[in-house]
């Protein structure tokens, strides 16, 4: 695309994998702007958490923004990454410079003022789009991600701004709800607190605000876009979302993964390998067994790389664990999450020493080595908007065993690149696992599936063009509306 046609796009997010992440949102927020920069000038706005401020990347203050209602004044800094990606940092120490995650303290308790913290992010995005940030760069389109950025499209609408916006739902279950009593301190107009606006069963919902006031809603897979219009997956918003779908304002665009996920070159792996170099893949498996204190074995190695939360169906994995062990398999589990889920994983490992190992926490290097060393990845998610782990695993020749839902259904070809099961039951899961035992017993079939999985086209190019087309449509409509 010529420089003349490059448009200015501001991503608004609470996570960026380069600096801070708790899940797939951080990966997407880092990868998609980079994948799109040959088409558009895409920059990112993120809160100034300690992980951002202390990242070692220079930050140059470019502007100051005043307060609004209970939202404090703040500064905006510019950070230039080594590869050229421009990050705008919202600097407000009283809101963001705290130990913990972007959302919770070191004990896992949500910050009581999260509504203030992320409303300030949304307002800053609106101020950016209005040209109130003293910068030569002003976005022509704002792309907000998940509930922490939900008020960005809302403030833009309430302030009468014409800049178009997109809101992407990464996980509808996390909605950012707060009492309606907070409306005054957030500067929310009364007319926005309606069923058509951000009111949700007597509360205010940040995610609903993003969906209600953005020009278009996207989700991270085509199947999930359909699922969230149904009671099973709609989290109480299915009717609202169906009305958006009926108006052509809801679409599903799949995520991708970046090019670093290459078994032949990944710097994290113990041993690089290519398709049909399975003895080299086994060297990674040996490392995983040693890391998780598993016995030496020639049986199948199953990996769990996951947040340890109810959504991920880990209770189902506990229910099938003995069946896996009795069939000669081993399980390596890494992740962190809800305390009761973490305790359940520890208890599972204690029941099967040498056969099941667990490491509470998350380490990117070890996770990559697990994808490379395992034969199968377990993903029995109750729902999965997109999922990235199943794509990482396939790229490294580990075949996913997953529930047939959301992005898992869109990215796994059953019996070709992995194994899908339909019901969230131990019985349905067990049937899929029995197929893995059969495939593992026939190396020529196992290796053929591995080759197909490693060749799957999970790059970001599949997402870039649909987003670019959506950007073009919204910008064209905006020009038409503002010229009338």
Curated annotation (Swiss-Prot):
UniProt pathway: Glycan biosynthesis; glycogen biosynthesis
Signal peptide span: none
Cross-referenced SUPFAM superfamilies: UDP-Glycosyltransferase/glycogen phosphorylase
Keywords attached to this entry: Glycogen biosynthesis, Glycosyltransferase, Transferase
EC category name: transferase
GO terms for biological process, alphabetical: glycogen biosynthetic process
Catalytic activity entry: [(1->4)-alpha-D-glucosyl](n) + ADP-alpha-D-glucose = [(1->4)-alpha-D-glucosyl](n+1) + ADP + H(+)
EC number from the UniProt entry: 2.4.1.21
Domain of life of the source: Bacteria
Binding site for ADP-alpha-D-glucose: 21
CDD domains named in the record: GT5_Glycogen_synthase_DULL1-like
Gene3D superfamilies: Glycogen Phosphorylase B
Function of the molecule: Synthesizes alpha-1,4-glucan chains using ADP-glucose.
PANTHER family linked: GLYCOGEN SYNTHASE, GRANULE-BOUND STARCH SYNTHASE 1, CHLOROPLASTIC/AMYLOPLASTIC
UniProt-recorded name of the protein: Glycogen synthase
Species per Swiss-Prot/TrEMBL record: Pseudomonas syringae pv. tomato (strain ATCC BAA-871 / DC3000)
